Amino acid sequence: MAVEDMDKKYRISDIARELQVSPQEVLRFVKEGGAKVASTSSMVDSEMRGLIFAEFSNEKKMVDETRKIRAEKQLRLTRLEEQSRRAVEKEQILRETLTPSPAPPVHEPPVRAAAQPAPVPVAAGEAPSPLAPETPAPATESAPAVAPAGVPAAEPVSEALSAPLPEPVPEPVPEPPAPEVVAVVEAVPNDQIVSYDAPKNIGGLTVLGTLDMQSEADRKKKGKKKNFREQAVALKDEFETPSSTTLDEDGVPKKKPVAGVQPEGFGVGKKKGKKKKPAVDDKVISANIRTTISGMDDSSGTGSRSKFRKQRKMEREREQEEADLLRESEQQIMRVTEYASPHELAELMGVTAKDIIQKCFALGKFVTINQRLDKESIELIALEFGFEAEFISEVEATAVEAVVDRDEDLETRPPVVTIMGHVDHGKTSLLDYIRNSNVVAGESGGITQHVAAYEVTASNGRKITFLDTPGHEAFTAMRARGAQVTDIVILVVAADDSVMPQTIEAINHAKAAGVPIVVAINKMDKPEANPEKIKTQLSEAGVLVEEWGGESQCQEISAKKGLGIEELMEKVLTEAEMRELKGNFSKDVPATGVIVESELDKGKGVISAVLVQRGYLKVGDPFVAGNIMGKVRALMDERGKRIPSAGPSQPVSVLGFEDLPQAGDVLTVMASDKEARDLAQKRQIIRREHEFRRSTRVKLDSIARQIKEGLMKELSVIIKADTDGSIQALADGLMKIQNEEVKVQIIHQGVGQITETDVLLAAASDAIIIGFRVRPNVNAKKLAEKEDLDVRFYSVIYHVLEDVEKALEGMLSPELHEESLGSLEIRQVFRVPKVGNVGGCHVLEGKILRDAKVRLLRDGVQIYDGMLDTLRRFKDDVKEVDAGYECGVGLKNYDDIKVGDVVEAYRIVEKKRKL
C-alpha cells in the first residue's frame, strides 16, 4: 500500500485549493524545486506534495488565525452592543419608576390608617399585577423564612416612621396582617438607594418589582460592583438635597431601619436587581463632587485672575494630552499607496527591504525588492510590523462626488480593446493592418502621426476603440493607478513559434484585471504554422479556447496578408455584446476620462491622448488629471481633425494641460477653474508628502557619508554588460567585496544595452547602474538624467571592483567625468585605397570635434573606443561638424564599420568629488 501511495499523483490546483493559496505560487515553488511541470493542471507525486505542504502550511495557519481573530473581534463587538443596549433599557425603566415618587406624601396617611383594618384588599390589589407570574415564587419561599422574625415587621414599619430601632419591636406578633406585611416589607429593600420609595406606595412597589426579572448572569455581573454601589450610596447620603430626605415624616431615620431589616434574607434578589442604577448615578455623583470641590477651590482663591490662570493651565494640560495621544496614534498609521513595492514599505516603516521580503516569504509570497504588492499583502505586512495601513493616492483628495448614472442615460458603447503579446509575434503588424484598412478616402499617404488610441469601424458599421500600449508594462501601470480602461484583450501568438514568457505574463495581467481574452493565432500563412501546438500550450498556461471546451474565443489570422482579420473583429464584437458594455451619454454629466499617453509638442505644448469614459468632453471645460489642471483648448481625433466634443469610448487628443500628466491618470471635468486649481494643489501636497518620505538617490560618491550616518546598509547594483561571461565575472567580484557596515547586492543583471526598464528598476530600488562595454539608449539616458541616477561605464573589470571598494571605504579619488559631445550615424561605407574604410555619416545630435574621443556602437553594444583619424566635409578637412550635416569619418586603426553603426563623440573632464 505504501508503494501505491508513493505512486499516487496529485494535481497542483487541488493542492493549492486545499492549502488556500494561489495555484501560481505553488507552481512557482514546484518549478524552483526542479520538477518539470507546465501548468497548475500538472500532476506531482506524494513526495513533492509533502514538500508543498511543508512550505505553505504557515500561510494556511496565517489565514486561519486571521479568520479566528476577526471572528473573536466581531463577537466582542456584539457583546458590547448587547450590554450597552441592556444598560440603556434598565436605565429607562429606573427613570420611569422614579417619576411618580414625589406623590407618596399625599397618600401616605390614608395608607397607614387602612393598613391594619384592610390588609387583604391590598394583597388582592397586588396579585393581578402583570409581574405576578414570577413574583409569587420568591415571595412564598421567603415567607416561611421570615415568619419568626419578619411577621412582627408590621409594627416596625409603623414604628420606623417615629423611631429608627427595629430590633426591640419583633416580640409583639399581630398574626392577621402578617401576609400583607411580607408583601410590604419585601418591596421596601428595593428603595434602599432612593429614599422616595420608602413609603408604602402600592403603585411604586408594584413597578419596582420588575427589577426582579433578571437573568442569573446579570445578577452575578452586577454583584461584582457591590463595593462601588455602597460607596455611591454613602456619597449620595452626604450630598443629598433636603427635599429628597424629607419626603416622609421623619424620613431620615426611616431609611436606616430599612437598611437594617434587608440583610435578614428576604430581599436579596431585589437588592441585586437594583444595582444598575448606582452605576448610572456614580457618574453623576462623581461629577457633582468634582464641581463642588472645584467651586470650593475657586472660592478660596485670591480672585478671578488666579481662577482664570488655573482654568487655562488645566485646559493646556488637557490639550497637550490629547495632542500626545493623537500623535502616538498617527505614528502607527502608515499612509501608503496601493501596489507599493517592498522597498517603499521599508522606507515608510523604518525597516529594511530584506525584512519585508522575509515576511513575504513567511506568508508564502515570493517577491522581489521592486515587485508591486497588492492591497491585502500590504495590510498583512503592516500588521506584522505593528502598523495600520491607510491607502492613499494623490487623487484621494478628490472632492468630486460621483453622480449616479440614470438608466435612461446609459447606452451601448464601443468596446475598448488592447492588443498584447510577444514582440515578435506580429502585434505591430496586426495594429498596422487594422489602422491602414480604415484610412478614409483622400488620405492615401496613410496616417502620418502616431496616436496611442484610435477608433475603427467594422464591416457591420459598429465601432471598436484600440489602445496601442507598449506591452503589458503600460497595461499594468494604468491598472496600478486605478484606471480600468480595457474591456477586451487580444492575445497575439505566432503559429510558427510557441507561447513565450511575455505571453504568459500578458495572460496573468489580463486575468488579474478580470478582462476576457480573445486569442489571435498569427502567421498562419507560413508552412511551419502549428495552431494545435499553440492551443495546447495556452491550455497549460490557463487559457482554454472554445474549440476545446473553454471560454476564450480563438481566431487564426495572418496580419501580413489580412486573412481572418474580419472574423477576429466579429468575435471581439460578440464578446462585447456578451459583456453588455454601457456608457453614460448624458451631456449634463461632468465628463471623465483616462490619460492613455502624453507628449510635449514644440508648437502646441502638452498633447495627451484621452479615452473618454463618461459624459461628453467639450472645448472650454476646466479639468483635473492627477495633480495637473488645465482647460480644454482643442480636441482632435486620431487623424488630427478638430472636433467639438467626444463621448464615451471615444479616443481624442486634448490640448490645454499645464504640465505632462502620467498615463493612467483620471481626467475629471470640474465646475470652474478655481475648483480645478484647488483640487490639483491638494493632490500635489499629498504626492510631495509621499515622495518626501522616500530616501534620496544613492550615489557612489556619497556612500561613505551615508554609511557613517547609518543611512546605508546595502549597495544595490544593476549590471549590464556585452557578454554573459563579463556579467558573471563582475557579479562574483562584487559579491566578494564585504564591509562591516555595508555589502553589495546585485538586484538585476543582463546582456545588452541599458534600457528604460533598467533605469526604472534602479529608481525604484535606489541602485546604481554599471555598464560594462555597453551604453544606454537615448530614452534611457534622458530618463536617468531626469531621475538623477548614478550610471557608470567601464571597460575593465578591475576598475569596477576598485571603484566600488574605494567608494565603500570613502577613498574615492577625483572623478573623471565624461561629457557627451554628439553622435552620428553611418549611412554608407566607402573603401579608400591606402586609407581603409571611411563612413559617410549624418550627425544626429550635438557637435562632432576632430580631436574628440569616440566610441563605435553596434546595436547598443560598444565595438570600438578610440580617436578619429579623419573628419571631412566635401573633401575638406574640418575641425567640427554640427547636427544635421553630413560628413566623412575614419577611425584610427579600425576598419570594421558597417551601415547603421552609431559613433558617439565625448571628452573626459576632471571633476572634484564632494564627500
UniProtKB/Swiss-Prot annotation:
Residues 111-129, 137-164 have a biased composition (Low complexity). GO terms for molecular function: GTP binding; GTPase activity; translation initiation factor activity. Residues 468-471 are annotated as: G3. Its main location: cytoplasm. Residues 446-450 are annotated as: G2. Residues 83-94, 314-328 have a biased composition (Basic and acidic residues). CDD domains: IF2_eIF5B (cd01887), IF2_mtIF2_II (cd03702), mtIF2_IVc (cd03692). Residues 293-305 have a biased composition (Polar residues). Residues 165-177 have a biased composition (Pro residues). Residues 83-177, 216-280, 293-328 are annotated as: Disordered. Residues 421-428 are annotated as: G1. The keyword Nucleotide-binding applies. GO terms for cellular component: cytoplasm. Residues 522-525 are annotated as: G4. Residues 412-582 form the tr-type G domain. InterPro entries: EF-G-like_DII (IPR053905), IF2_II (IPR044145), IF2_N (IPR006847), P-loop_NTPase (IPR027417), Small_GTP-bd (IPR005225), T_Tr_GTP-bd_dom (IPR000795), TF_IF2_bacterial-like (IPR000178), TIF_IF2 (IPR015760). GTP binds at residues 421-428, 468-472, 522-525. It is found in: Cytoplasm. The keyword Protein transport does not apply. Belongs to the TRAFAC class translation factor GTPase superfamily. Classic translation factor GTPase family. IF-2 subfamily. One of the essential components for the initiation of protein synthesis. Protects formylmethionyl-tRNA from spontaneous hydrolysis and promotes its binding to the 30S ribosomal subunits. Also involved in the hydrolysis of GTP during the formation of the 70S ribosomal complex. This is Translation initiation factor IF-2. It comes from Chlorobium luteolum (strain DSM 273 / BCRC 81028 / 2530).
